[in-house]
């Protein structure tokens, strides 16, 4: 097999810099990381200096993802020699257990890490990842709640908890998690959109009105958010046809839905689609408008 450096005519410095760039971007291109990283380690290890240790870790994680346990084990052994007793290296050992589906061994290892260092967030998150991999969502939810009691500012954990609640159809608790996220990230249009979707799913006039409000907010923050635009149309349409809504509320929401449908129509007209696709897309929007007119009459 040809070497990466020969195949693409790149120097070892360029390969090292590429690995650094992938780390900074949190890239999940495991195959490329394995190809470039394995050559760096084998051919240029002596030139890498202290960079070699972070590259060993990077390559090991990619190798697990790519199914190269031989390479993952080699990198892990080198890291163990250099950093005996390191919690970070122990966590990597646990990740290898996970890849081998030795979940009980991995959890025992993470528990030992947490006994020595209760603030080790990485070990806690790996335990939660195992529960999810096993389909044990209830246990994952319990552990995430315990984690958030100590690390309330972890936005990634709040979002993960919201997703788990959605999977369990516990929409009230999912909404609470998303409210926490919106408090700290008021300009994140995706959180507004997801909160609106949860409220829409809950149903009922009050939730539908909140849903429409937050779909509109998501659009205000990002006017290219087509999912929010469709959500605005759907929520306003349902409010307009809700028997509990007042006449004024129905009339106002008919206007909102009509506006949303016209914006969807316009977006499809300007999209770079084939004529056939545009024809069917526009037909769908026209059907929306026709439905509105029928409801209004």
From Swiss-Prot:
Membrane topology: Peripheral membrane protein
Lineage: superkingdom: Eukaryota
Keyword terms, alphabetized: Acetylation, Endoplasmic reticulum, Membrane, Repeat, TPR repeat, Ubl conjugation
TPR repeats: 87-120, 155-188, 192-225
PROSITE patterns: TPR, TPR_REGION
PTM comment, free text: Ubiquitinated when soluble in the cytoplasm, leading to its degradation by the proteasome. Interaction with EMC2 prevents its ubiquitination and degradation.
UniProt main location, coarse: endoplasmic reticulum
Modified residues (N-acetylalanine): 2
Pfam families membership: TPR_EMC2 (PF22890)
GO biological process: protein insertion into ER membrane by stop-transfer membrane-anchor sequence; tail-anchored membrane protein insertion into ER membrane
Localization per Swiss-Prot or TrEMBL: Endoplasmic reticulum membrane
GO molecular function, one term: membrane insertase activity
GO cellular component, one term: cytoplasm
Positions carrying N6-acetyllysine: 255
UniProt cross-references to SUPFAM superfamilies, sorted A to Z: TPR-like
Job of this protein: Part of the endoplasmic reticulum membrane protein complex (EMC) that enables the energy-independent insertion into endoplasmic reticulum membranes of newly synthesized membrane proteins. Preferentially accommodates proteins with transmembrane domains that are weakly hydrophobic or contain destabilizing features such as charged and aromatic residues. Involved in the cotranslational insertion of multi-pass membrane proteins in which stop-transfer membrane-anchor sequences become ER membrane spanning helices.
Oligomer and partners: Component of the ER membrane protein complex (EMC). Interacts with WNK1 (via amphipathic alpha-helix region); promoting the ER membrane protein complex assembly by preventing EMC2 ubiquitination.
UniProt record similarity statement: Belongs to the EMC2 family.
Protein's name according to its UniProt entry: ER membrane protein complex subunit 2
Gene: EMC2
């Amino acid at each position: 097999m040809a070497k990466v450096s020969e195949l693409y005519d790149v120097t070892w410095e360029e390969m090292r810099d590429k690995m650094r760039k992938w780390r900074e971007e949190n890239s999940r291109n495991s195959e490329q990381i394995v190809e470039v990283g394995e050559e760096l380690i084998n051919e240029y290890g002596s030139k890498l200096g202290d960079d070699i240790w972070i590259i060993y870790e990077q390559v090991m994680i990619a190798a697990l993802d790519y199914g190269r346990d031989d390479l993952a084990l080699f990198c892990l052994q080198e890291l163990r020699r250099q950093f005996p007793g390191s919690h970070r290296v122990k966590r990597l050992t646990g990740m290898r257990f996970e890849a081998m589906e030795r979940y009980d061994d991995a959890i025992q290892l993470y528990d030992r890490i947490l006994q020595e260092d209760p603030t080790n967030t990485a070990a806690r998150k790996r335990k939660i990842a195992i529960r999810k991999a096993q389909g044990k969502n209830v246990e994952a939810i319990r552990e995430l709640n315990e984690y958030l009691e100590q690390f309330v500012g972890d936005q990634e954990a709040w979002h993960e908890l919201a997703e788990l609640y959605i999977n369990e159809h516990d929409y009230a608790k999912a909404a609470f998690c998303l409210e926490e996220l919106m408090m700290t990230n008021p300009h994140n249009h995706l959180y507004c959109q997801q909160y609106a979707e949860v409220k829409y799913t809950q149903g009922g006039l009050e939730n539908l009105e909140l849903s429409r409000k937050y779909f509109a907010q998501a659009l205000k923050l990002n006017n290219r958010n087509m999912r929010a635009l469709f959500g605005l149309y759907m929520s306003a349409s349902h409010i307009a046809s809700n028997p509990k809504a007042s006449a004024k509320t129905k009339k106002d929401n008919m206007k909102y839905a009509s506006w949303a449908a016209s914006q969807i129509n316009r977006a499809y007209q300007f999209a770079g689609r084939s004529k056939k696709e545009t024809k069917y897309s526009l037909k769908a929007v026209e059907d929306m408008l026709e439905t509105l007119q029928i409801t209004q009459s």
